[in-house]
Amino acid sequence: MLVAQQLGQWAEQTALKLLKEQNYEWVASNYHSRRGEVDLIVKRGNELIFVEVKARGQGNYGQACEMVTLSKQKKIIKTAMRFLQRYPSYQDFYCRFDVICFDFPQKIAKTVQQDFSKFHYDLQWIENAFTLD
């Protein structure tokens, strides 16, 4: 498995742990449709949150949150709409789009299996990062 894939999986698992610590309930991971993918879907009360998770190592251009482009946002929104069509029990929920980002200030070796939790990283959780508008 490539280090980038390992980092992505670690970031999604760590983000889900963080969300659960904040009393969110897991609904789905890596929900796919023809239109795209949503990394995590969680709920709390009558809120349904679609979460994009990004992680970047030092040496990559830009910060992780900058990688959630307008095009990516549109794909996430379309995928969320498909999820709501497929699971109508969630249609009355208030929907929110969050982004959780992990930025590693150090370079990460590309050929070695890593325990990313041992690295220092900056965490940014942006609630309501984008909307349907």
Swiss-Prot record:
Domain of life: Bacteria
Molecular function per GO: nucleic acid binding
One of the Pfam families matching this protein, by short name: UPF0102
SUPFAM superfamilies, alphabetized: Restriction endonuclease-like
InterPro entries: Restrct_endonuc-II-like, tRNA_endonuc-like_dom_sf, UPF0102_YraN-like
Protein family: Belongs to the UPF0102 family.
NCBIfam families assigned to the protein according to its UniProt record, in alphabetical order: PRK12497.1-3 (NF009150), PRK14674.1 (NF011267), YraN family protein (TIGR00252)
Protein name in UniProt: UPF0102 protein A1S_1049
Annotated organism of origin: Acinetobacter baumannii (strain ATCC 17978 / DSM 105126 / CIP 53.77 / LMG 1025 / NCDC KC755 / 5377)
